[in-house]
Amino acid sequence: MHFHERFDVIVVGGGHAGTEAALAAARMGSKTLLLTHNIDTLGQMSCNPAIGGIGKGHLVKEIDALGGAMAIATDYAGIQFRTLNSSKGPAVRATRAQADRALYRQKIQNILQNQANLRIFQQAVDDLIVENDRVVGVVTQMGLAFESPAIVLTTGTFLSGKIHIGLENYSGGRAGDPPAIALANRLRELPIRVGRLKTGTPPRIDANTIDFSQMAEQKGDSPLPVMSFMGDVSHHPKQISCWITHTNEKTHEIIRGGLDRSPMYSGVIEGIGPRYCPSIEDKIHRFSDKSSHQIFIEPEGLNTTEIYPNGISTSLPFDVQLNLVRSIKGMENAEIVRPGYAIEYDYFDPRDLKNSLETKTINGLFFAGQINGTTGYEEAAAQGLLAGMNASLQVQGKDAWCPRRDEAYLGVLVDDLSTLGTKEPYRMFTSRAEYRLLLREDNADIRLTAKGRELGLVDDIRWAAFSEKLESIELELQRLRAQWVHPNSPLIHALNPHLNTPISREASFEELLRRPEMDYSKLMQIEGFGPGLEDPLAAEQVQIQVKYSGYIQRQQEEINKAVRNENTGLPLHLDYKEVPGLSNEVIAKLNSHKPETIGQASRISGVTPAAISILLVHLKKRGLLRKSA
């Protein structure tokens, strides 16, 4: 049975990757269908109720700069906002928001329902229709076929999902949802390498049974940050506190005593878990010298008593979970309302993807999110936006696009995955980026919004606001460079008290701002130097561009040298055995990875600079050198 309409792009799955993929394709004018097994759970925060953080907040800002929904929804749902690393340099500062699950889901669903060119249909997908190595549609659980030349799979943890609590396990996509068994079996038939990964979640606690007076209160920031470049503090709901407590030796003894019934330590779980978000039993085992681990007590919303104890993800049996929770200060009488669990699921080797997130072997088939081996809402959403965008570009007959490593954390994420692959759930950190001084949260719009506009992702309202901000920054930078003060100027009397050493020669306002003791706000408050910019985001941009100009210029010079390799494409079907002079190890690795550019090839472990030189000579001789898209 065939559905009566044909679609340009079909997105399978309605989590963070799927919603951004569907919205991106629809914004670009493609007739888009979002298929989900349950419309009510679109935009669901399946694990921790938070968005952003180190590296992750940078991705959220980039999604926002490209017109995505995550940051906007967070501003409407965030019940506590904090800027992490606020005392450090701008490259590593990151925004994190505690979110109300219900408000976040509602806002995402509202955005989806009001997006032009987007249809939503409730049905699980069981099969792909593939003809001559090209996907042409999908078949749902009830045998209904939908036709489309571009399919984006964002299946999360649902592919052959198996939930573990102690030594008991059962099939599930997440607690309360069925797994996607038929689709997983179909995907295993494709010529793409498959593996198993694991993630987990902590037990949820009834707030009415917690003694918060025994814990340290953690308040949000004041003034309140916003997540979206289009956001406003007035969008935020009521703000509340989180709390901090710790495990202790008794907690650790309880956990050690339950390890014989842990699915992780009894060999029941095959999949590898996230290194940077380990279960509490893994922490106790790996860091046996530590007598205590920090736990963040995070409310799940304004109208629920459920608490998310961040730091005690576990798949131990329920009785052990209850005992370990009650051993923690402030939770001696706590009641669990939902048990913690681990979930195993299929993922596919991202080295089998192009950097557009299209599979190398099946034309028109795109993967995004946990199916590619990543962990985290933000990583999934960023991939979803990119996959949905490239699916739309393909349907329109246009070249695919992915930012380079020096242009966005999204570029770092995709390059790491498609070049190096992953054996464990991949999460983003600022340390993964070589050029992080240029890849800051504050300049994500300056880096990406113009490209988003060119691609059709950015609407008129966002573009007008961005253009106005950009113009104000440029005009203010010009003013600071053009205006000067000299030692005999009348302005000196107001200025000198704010300087560590009085000026002895003529100096521009820009040079004054570059002094370590001076900041933009202080300079603008001195008589004769203001009034300056009213927009705090534009003012911040002026200050960073002035104070870090030397470092930024040096990093840009490094990038300019590296870009040549990034833009030199490699034929995907090149057999590296035909390249004389390459070692057997290099041949094997290049044939396995099938890099798309010389830059990607150079980052594969074991591929030496000498091998790259040999490869370039071979390609040039045979006229195979080309610029990548």
UniProtKB/Swiss-Prot annotation:
Subcellular location, principal: cytoplasm
Cofactor: FAD
Chain positions recorded as NAD(+) binding sites: 273-287
GO annotation (BP), single: tRNA methylation
Pfam families according to UniProt: GIDA, GIDA_C_1st, SAM_GIDA_C
Keywords per UniProt: Cytoplasm, FAD, Flavoprotein, NAD, tRNA processing
Ligand binding (FAD): 13-18
Taxonomy, superkingdom: Bacteria
Keyword Nucleotide-binding: no
CC terms in the record's Gene Ontology section: cytosol
Keyword Hydrolase among record annotations: no
Molecular function GO labels: flavin adenine dinucleotide binding
Compartment(s) of residence: Cytoplasm
Subunit: Homodimer. Heterotetramer of two MnmE and two MnmG subunits.
Function of the molecule: NAD-binding protein involved in the addition of a carboxymethylaminomethyl (cmnm) group at the wobble position (U34) of certain tRNAs, forming tRNA-cmnm(5)s(2)U34.
Family: Belongs to the MnmG family.
UniProt-recorded name of the protein: tRNA uridine 5-carboxymethylaminomethyl modification enzyme MnmG
